[in-house]
Regions:
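Short glycine-rich anion-binding loops that position phosphate/pyrophosphate groups of nucleotides
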Residues: 3-7, 87-89
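A contiguous loop/helix-start segment that scaffolds small-molecule binding in enzyme catalytic cores
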Residues: 76-146
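Fold-independent oxyanion-binding glycine-rich loops
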Residues: 3-4, 33, 55, 111-113, ...
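General beta-strand structural signal in soluble alpha/beta enzymes
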Residues: 2, 29-32, 83, 109
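Short glycine-/acidic-enriched loop or helix-start segments at secondary-structure transitions
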Residues: 9-11, 39, 93-94, 119
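Class I SAM-dependent methyltransferase SAM-binding "motif I" and its flanking Rossmann-like core
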Residues: 11-73
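Generic anion/oxyanion-binding catalytic loop in active/binding sites
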Residues: 5, 28, 79
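Short, small-residue-enriched loops and turns at beta-alpha junctions
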Residues: 6-8, 58-60, 117
Length: 146
């Protein structure tokens, strides 16, 4: 059992499940909230086609390249793109999104899902500029769509 989130999804619990599967042990997933699914549900974005990418590169050039690639997939495939960041790097992630994505691209920031102080808002990149919330110590999921 993992301590937070959805065990084995963007979580080291996947390694334990893989070992259990190799040993032919019965694996029983328990119903519970998944911030990935909940963020798609609350974003207003495409819930029929979406991709979760986990953590994006930390190095600025690589991160910018990845953000542009994800944004291209939004427009080419009509696919919602989701990713996460370590809470202390949330502000930098938002800045990088605002710097590298088109003004009309939509960004949903979903933070503290199912917890006190839950924050889920969707705006265009243009509309987020100058309105970045304080999320430095809060688990967040970032979603891009058109």
């Amino acid at each position: 059992i993992s301590e937070a989130g959805c065990p084995a999804v963007a979580d080291p619990g996947a390694d334990v499940v893989a070992i259990a599967q190799r040993q032919k042990l019965k694996v029983i997933p328990l119903v519970g909230p998944s911030s990935i699914i909940l963020s798609v549900m609350a974003s207003g974005f495409n819930g029929q086609s979406f991709a979760f990418h986990g953590y994006l590169p930390i190095e600025p050039g690589e991160r910018a390249k990845k953000l542009k690639t994800l944004e291209q997939r939004v427009y080419a495939e009509s696919q919602t793109q989701l990713f996460i960041e370590t809470p202390y790097r949330n502000h930098k992630m938002i800045e990088d999104i605002l710097q590298n994505c088109r003004p009309q691209t939509k960004l949903c920031i979903a933070a503290n899902i199912t917890c006190e102080g839950e924050f889920i808002q969707t705006r265009t990149v243009k509309d987020w500029k100058g309105h970045i919330p304080e999320l430095s110590k809060i688990p967040c999921i970032f979603l891009l769509y058109k």
